[in-house]
């Protein structure tokens, strides 16, 4: 009897914990359903949302509002990628919400900076921007530790692969990526960054914890 009671308490505790994680999210989705739907995602993003390829983003721990917004952008065509656009076309709104809260619930993998020799430059840009050419400090939107801003749909950057981040900044600068919408906030910033700035920033945020 005692063993049955202990098991019931343990199961109830786990259920409440899972519910709490979901309740804390700003997106109305099911973690359990998202996990069941995530098999295809793991081929590129890894079984726990942490990609083994530096060109594919880590999405574990990424805030759900941002993930949901990007999935919708891929489906609607305001953001394009041969693989992601095709996958997003198959997803319903509920599928996207479930996947977003599932990956948000997973622990993000910690990484070190890619190039230690550029830390000072990357940190200066991230924390102070560049007043000479109008580059805003990254932490204003992405936070001092790169955790992002879920309510504003600003992504977490900490631990993100430097190669992936550099590609996104380059795409914003060239206009190949326009998913910042009418605000143009990322395009306006990225086009003012040099290649060296992009490399230093990308390396620095990879090591944020």
Model-assigned labels for residue ranges:
Residues 1-23:
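Gram-negative bacterial Sec-dependent N-terminal signal peptides
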Residues 21-38, 52-55, 105-132:
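Electrostatic cytochrome c docking/interface patches
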Residues 26-77:
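The feature marks the first
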Residues 30, 37, 63, 70, ...:
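Stable alpha-helical elements in mature extracytoplasmic
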Residues 34, 41-47, 99, 135-144, ...:
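The canonical Cys-X-X-Cys-His
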Residues 35-39, 64, 68, 129-139, ...:
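Sequence context surrounding c-type heme c attachment/ligation sites in exported
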Residues 52-58, 74-115, 150-156, 174-199, ...:
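Axial heme c-ligation environment in periplasmic c-type cytochrome domains
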